[in-house]
């Protein structure tokens, strides 16, 4: 019996389940999806720093420079640094006393 589809109702002095043990494919699929969703949510909350740090650094790696002459690599680095320097002006520095 699936915990996700169970309906409990008071019967006399006991708690009983009004649903029958369904082997309906839709109920089975919904149960599996629900359990997987719960597992993924728990893992996300436990390891969110590791997961998002990996994606953040993975996206910032930039294009491969294999086979590119050193002069072009240096030019690319300067362009990237100037873009970063230009973006620094958008941040506000707040100092607390």
Swiss-Prot record:
The M2 protein from most influenza A strains is inhibited by amantadine and rimantadine, resulting in viral uncoating incapacity. Emergence of amantadine-resistant variants is usually rapid. One of its GO terms (molecular function) is proton transmembrane transporter activity. It is found in: Virion membrane; Host apical cell membrane. Residues 59-88 are annotated as: Disordered. The chain crosses the membrane at residues 23-43. Coiled coil: none annotated. The modification Phosphoserine is found at residues 64, 82, 93. The record marks 41 as: Seems to be involved in pH gating. The record marks 37 as: Essential for channel activity, possibly by being protonated during channel activation, and by forming the channel gate and the selective filter. It is a single-pass type III membrane protein. Signal peptide: none annotated. A lipid is attached at residue 50 (S-palmitoyl cysteine). Belongs to the influenza viruses matrix protein M2 family. Forms a proton-selective ion channel that is necessary for the efficient release of the viral genome during virus entry. After attaching to the cell surface, the virion enters the cell by endocytosis. Acidification of the endosome triggers M2 ion channel activity. When the channel is activated, one or more imidazole moieties of His-37 probably become bi-protonated. This is Matrix protein 2. It comes from Influenza A virus (strain A/Memphis/1/1971 H3N2). The gene is M.
